Amino acid sequence: MSDECLIAKIVYLSLQQKEVTQQMIADELKMSQQSVSRKLKELEERNLVRRSLSKEGEIIRVTENGEKLLEDCLSMMRATIISSHVLEIRGRATSGLGEGRIFLSMPYYMESFKKFLGFEPYPGTLNLVIYDRISLENRLVLDISKAINIPEHKEENRVLGAVRAFPASVNDLKPAAVVFPLRSVHPKSVIEVISPYHLRKELNIKDGDEVVIQAYA
């Protein structure tokens, strides 16, 4: 495991727990404590982590140098993403619960998509389930890519959550966009696509059909 991945795992655990112990890291990585201890010692010698003893065991904290290493790694990933521009995601069409229709019936979102994406979407989303590893990796890359951001909007008695969007094509049809509402209940393996077209009708898409998305990041 690379130093960056181990540091990222420690940071991830620290977001869930007040203190991260060596045992927690070993359990999370399914590695022996001896192997984890050797790796942590190397990181400590490079001033990337600090180790201290407590009644819970050995506590691990990431240093400023460790955080900087992680930030540099993330910057390189972003640079790679920017240079690639297009991310292909394949998925199979699936019926949603009607949430997309409700979401797109709200004037704020309709007006915002028209303003930021240049089109007024059909009142409904095309939901796709990602089924292959490369497509899922590309989907996850979008999480750290620069998106078109629809800001959160406060109304009198409710708050409409922010949305991240990426211009896209659907089976080569444009315009369209992949959208990620920040309050979505969907897992990472499900994406929502909007377009001014009724995509199922326009492209004759049925549940289970493979759909190819080209997302522009």
UniProtKB/Swiss-Prot annotation:
Keywords for this protein: Flavoprotein, FMN, Kinase, Magnesium, Metal-binding, Nucleotide-binding, Transferase
Binding site for FMN: S184, E192
Cofactor: record remark: Binds 1 Mg(2+) ion per subunit.
Positions of the UniProt region annotated as H-T-H motif-like: 1-86
UniProt binding sites for Mg(2+): T125, N127
EC number: 2.7.1.161
InterPro entries given in the database record: HTH_MarR-typ (IPR000835), RibK_CTP-dep (IPR039063), Riboflavin_kinase_archaeal (IPR023470), Riboflavin_kinase_CTP-dep (IPR023602), Riboflavin_kinase_dom_sf (IPR023465), WH-like_DNA-bd_sf (IPR036388), WH_DNA-bd_sf (IPR036390)
Keyword Nucleotide-binding assigned: yes
Reaction equation(s) it catalyzes: riboflavin + CTP = CDP + FMN + H(+)
Gene Ontology biological-process entries: FMN biosynthetic process; riboflavin biosynthetic process
Positions contributing to CDP binding: G96, L97, G98, E99, G100, R101, Y197, H198, L199, R200
Stretches for region Riboflavin kinase: 87-217
UniProt cofactor(s): Mg(2+)
Top-level taxon: Archaea
Xref: Pfam families: CTP-dep_RFKase, MarR_2
This protein's pathway: Cofactor biosynthesis; FMN biosynthesis; FMN from riboflavin (CTP route): step 1/1
GO molecular function, a single term: DNA-binding transcription factor activity
Function, in words: Catalyzes the CTP-dependent phosphorylation of riboflavin (vitamin B2) to form flavin mononucleotide (FMN).
Family: Belongs to the archaeal riboflavin kinase family.
Protein name (database record): Riboflavin kinase
Lineage: Archaea, Thermoproteota, Thermoprotei, Sulfolobales, Sulfolobaceae
